């Protein structure tokens, strides 16, 4: 080997060896052997800015659930296929990620949180108390075609009440839906409600009850594919004349008609008054008593495509973003646990589409794209010390502020950039002590000057980063300024 060429060790994942001549490096293996970093189609990574916004949304709705007496649970991502698919239709099975594990068991990833919840109730029935009100926020998977706003992996946010079949539990779920949207700052929305029982009675009069599941799934597409396409698909299984009548049931009256007018219309089509229409009237009266009925409309076209719904059903739309689709939907399912236990347990619940709702909140300007957890960051200014910065941050934390300290004295523009990327609006500069008076260099323990009780009088500069405006004050006055300056 030539004296001016030296063989050096290297990283085996990159190359077997490298030859160095002066400052040039030549690798003996191609870099194309590196694995390309990418996610599966229909799946996503979430950067901190995205995950923070989602975490804040989850925190808000979780507080609403807890305040209404709902408790958290969790279930496995994988279930036996027979547990998930026993009550499903062929369309659902096509969307399920299903496979045999190493032990030859037929298993599948959960496609929603309701079916696993029914299994959970049956398996732990003796350990639970009823009515049992739970919330569950977790990922689900569906193998549908990826498109804008639709993914194969996404988070569902479910809340249900089981063990009581009465108008109040139906109302309670609707009230929580209303409260969650209000807590998120949404004011312009409508919750569309209907009842599967009324629609099934109507189909029975048309002698189509044995085809109800197929018809329900087609009618459920009305808002997506339009009246003409729905009539065309219905005609294939019900005939043209009956297809027209079915669509007329769902859209025969103006959406501006009042609740009782629409209810009387579908009640007549279904053959008269019955427990299902009585339930709708009772629920609506409870909504009126609570002073929230103005955000609810009776919409017979709402059917929900899933098989297990048997009673009241509902979907929620943001009035200013109708193209977004439903952001919260659900209904009553009286027969779901009957698949897993002899005694059936009646239940009612809803699911919030977190990702879709978050996208809508961003479009409406309700959620900032620069949302962050931290109230303020302590910048490391030349001439100061990390000990004074750390002590000041500890003082603010004891005052209830969420504070971060920049760890090293980099250029101030770099520190600004760091804060802005994390969505931090406020920056804090701790004024250095006069030259010769700083005891930070003392080697033995924490000096008296840094005791937390003495930090309150530290002179500081508080900077509002979006506007670059700056205020001189004492550290003890910072908490009030941060709280008063929050947008």
Where are each of the predicted segments found?
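Positively charged, Gly/Ser-enriched RNA/tRNA-binding surfaces
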Residues: 32, 53-68, 79-82, 103-104, ...
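Short, conserved phosphate-binding/catalytic loop or strand-edge motifs used
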Residues: 151-157, 193-201
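Short hydrophobic alpha-helical segments enriched in small aliphatic residues
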Residues: 5, 16-18
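Short terminal hydrophobic/aromatic SLiMs and anchors at protein ends
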Residues: 5-8, 439
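Acidic, His- and aromatic-enriched active-site or binding-groove loops in soluble protein domains
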Residues: 94-103, 208-230, 318
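Auxiliary tRNA-acceptor-end handling modules of aminoacyl-tRNA synthetases
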Residues: 31-51
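Polyanion/phosphate-binding surface patch
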Residues: 42, 73, 77-107
């Amino acid at each position: 080997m030539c004296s001016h060429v030296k063989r050096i060790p290297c990283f085996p994942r990159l190359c077997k060896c490298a030859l160095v001549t002066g400052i040039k490096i030549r690798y003996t293996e191609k870099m194309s052997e590196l694995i390309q970093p990418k996610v599966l189609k229909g799946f996503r990574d979430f950067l901190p800015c995205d995950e923070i916004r989602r975490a804040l949304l989850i925190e808000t709705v979780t507080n609403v659930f807890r305040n209404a007496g709902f408790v958290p649970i969790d279930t496995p991502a994988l279930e036996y296929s027979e547990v998930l698919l026993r009550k499903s239709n062929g369309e659902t099975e096509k969307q399920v990620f299903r496979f045999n594990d190493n032990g030859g068991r037929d298993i599948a990833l959960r496609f929603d949180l309701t079916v696993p919840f029914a299994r959970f109730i049956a398996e732990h029935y003796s350990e639970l108390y009823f009515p049992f009100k739970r919330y569950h926020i977790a990922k689900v998977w569906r193998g549908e075609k990826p498109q804008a706003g639709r993914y194969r992996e996404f988070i569902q946010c479910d809340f249900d009440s089981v063990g009581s079949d009465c108008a109040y539990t139906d109302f309670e779920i609707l009230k929580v839906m209303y409260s969650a949207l209000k807590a998120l700052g949404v004011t312009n929305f409508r919750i569309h409600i209907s009842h599967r029982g009324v629609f099934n009675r109507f189909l029975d009069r048309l002698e189509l009850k044995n085809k109800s599941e197929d018809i329900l799934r087609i009618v459920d597409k009305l808002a997506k594919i339009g009246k003409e396409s729905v009539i065309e698909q219905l005609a294939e299984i019900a005939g043209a004349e009956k297809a027209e009548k079915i669509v007329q049931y769902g859209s025969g009256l103006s959406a501006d008609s009042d609740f009782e007018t629409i209810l009387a219309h579908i009640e007549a089509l279904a053959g008269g008054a019955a427990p299902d229409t009585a339930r709708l009237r009772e629920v609506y009266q409870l909504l009126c008593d609570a002073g929230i009925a103005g955000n609810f409309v009776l919409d017979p076209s709402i059917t929900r495509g899933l098989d297990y719904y048997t009673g009241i059903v509902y979907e929620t739309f943001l009035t200013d973003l109708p193209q977004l689709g439903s952001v919260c939907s659900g209904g009553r399912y009286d027969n779901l646990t009957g698949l897993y236990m002899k005694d059936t347990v009646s239940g009612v619940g809803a699911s919030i589409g977190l990702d879709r709702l978050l996208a809508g909140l961003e479009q409406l300007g309700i959620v900032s794209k620069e949302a962050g957890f931290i109230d303020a960051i302590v910048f490391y200014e030349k001439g100061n010390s990390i000990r004074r910065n750390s002590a000041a941050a500890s003082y603010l934390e004891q005052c209830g502020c969420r504070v971060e300290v920049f760890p090293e004295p980099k250029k101030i523009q770099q520190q600004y950039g760091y804060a802005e990327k994390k969505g931090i609006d406020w920056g804090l500069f701790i004024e250095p002590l006069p030259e010769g008076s700083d005891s930070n260099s003392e080697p033995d323990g924490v000096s008296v000057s840094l005791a937390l009780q003495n930090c309150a009088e530290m002179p500081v500069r508080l900077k509002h980063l979006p506007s670059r405006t700056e205020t001189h004050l004492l550290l003890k006055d910072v908490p009030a300024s941060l709280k008063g300056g929050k947008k």
